[in-house]
Design a protein with these regions (language model features):
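ATP/NTP phosphate-donor binding region
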Residues: 2, 6-57, 291, 298, ...
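Glycine-rich beta-strand-to-loop/alpha-helix junction loops that act as flexible
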Residues: 7, 61-63, 84-86
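ATP/nucleoside-binding phosphotransfer catalytic cores, i.e., glycine-rich phosphate-binding loops
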Residues: 14, 174, 205, 215-340
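Catalytic core of DAGKc-family lipid kinases
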Residues: 28, 76-80, 86-188
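Short glycine/serine/threonine-rich phosphate/pyrophosphate-binding segments
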Residues: 43, 65-70, 91
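Glycine-rich phosphate/pyrophosphate-binding beta-alpha loops
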Residues: 132, 187-200, 266
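A generic structural signal for short beta-strands and their flanking turns/coil linkers
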Residues: 166-168, 182-184, 207-212, 246-250
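Active-site loop ensemble at the mouth of alpha/beta enzyme cores that anchors a bound cofactor
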Residues: 200-208
Length: 340
């Protein structure tokens, strides 16, 4: 058995992870080869080369973007994907119940099982977690321009941009039916979440051969707390502003070209966006004792609490900033009046 490690920028120290990997990897099962990515798209090329060489597994050290680059070269091959998550969201790893701690993730590489999962395509670009149009795609574009990474940066961009983003009207064609929606966003889930346990498609599974589509209709500021709460509570599909359905293929028609996202990465596409599911296309190393499409209750509870705290802190900070601006403006106006 052979293993290739891909390395790319992320939120944790890769050198430390590589040290742990050298210490903990089962040398009797794996011959270790470490290759550093040098540019965007480099992982696609090298993973394809390793798949042609019939490597047993290619291990992604990074987040969903890195995983996407590697996995797209491994679909419909005998080479499995392994994940040591250290990105800003880690949506696919979380869905697969791969531990966020690198040492424990390495244990999964040594002792895990190989499962076969679905993946999706958006205008023939592969995705493994989620894709979509609308606000989440717009935020992914802003996030890609940010100097800082991580969940707080994403949350900050989400809160700031939500104040000025305007919903669009979309025509949806799915499995023979056509619908028209005015929507804030349309998300297509192969997996259940964006990352950081933000469940945009809470009922999605990786092996049912279906896309889980979530439509968020226009909402008011009064809806934000409940939407945020339910996003992390895995119940957003119960909100009255949400429409959901399942399909194998979906065409999204919009009035003009714009940004889409796939696994959190933005890309410009035209008026027509075609999304489809590809059944059982990728082999993945998963925990041996993982329950199908459930997660550790205590871990989910802690992640949920952390998510709510981040949202609350961000709202408080945003409100405090706005109040300060109003107060400063009031002081300036008062000074002008007193000088008259």
């Amino acid at each position: 058995r052979q293993m290739c490690i891909r390395d790319r920028s992320g939120t944790q120290s890769k050198e430390q992870i590589l040290k742990w990997l050298d210490e903990k990897l089962d040398k009797e099962r794996y011959a270790q080869e470490v290759i550093y990515t040098e540019r965007a798209g480099h992982a696609v090329e090298i993973a394809a080369q390793k798949a042609q060489e019939d490597a047993h597994a290619v291990i992604a050290i990074g987040g969903d973007g890195t995983i996407n680059e590697i996995a797209r070269s491994l679909v419909h091959t005998k080479t499995a994907l392994g994940i040591i998550p250290c990105g800003s969201g880690n949506g696919l790893a979380r869905h697969l119940q791969i531990p966020m701690e690198p040492k424990k993730a390495i244990d999964i590489i040594n002792d895990g099982l190989i499962d076969i999962i679905d993946y999706g395509k958006i205008n023939d670009v592969p995705f493994f977690c989620t894709c979509g149009v609308g606000f989440d795609a717009f935020v992914s574009l802003q996030f890609s321009k940010a100097g800082r990474r991580g969940p707080l940066t994403y949350l900050e961009k989400t809160l700031l941009e939500s104040l000025k983003y305007r919903p669009e009207t979309y025509e949806l064609e799915m499995d023979g039916s056509t619908l028209r929606y005015k929507a804030f966003l349309i998300a297509c889930g192969n997996a259940s979440q964006y990352g950081n346990n933000a469940y945009i498609a809470p009922q999605a599974t990786l092996n049912d051969g279906l896309l889980d589509v979530t439509i968020l209709e226009p909402f008011t500021v009064l809806d934000v707390p409940s939407l945020s709460f339910q996003l992390f509570n895995k119940t957003i599909d119960q909100n009255s502003r949400i429409k959901t359905f399942r399909c194998q293929t979906l065409r999204i028609h919009r009035s003009k070209p714009g940004v889409v996202h796939f696994d959190g990465d933005p890309m410009m596409m035209g008026e027509n966006v075609d999304v489809k599911i590809m059944k059982k296309g990728l082999q993945v190393i998963v925990p041996r004792d993982a329950e199908k499409d459930t997660s550790n209750v205590l871990q989910r509870a802690q992640d949920y609490i952390n998510g709510l705290k981040q949202i609350n802190d961000a709202f408080v900070e945003d409100i405090a900033h706005k109040n300060k601006m109003i107060l400063d403006k009031g002081k300036r106006q008062f000074k002008k009046l007193t000088k008259m």
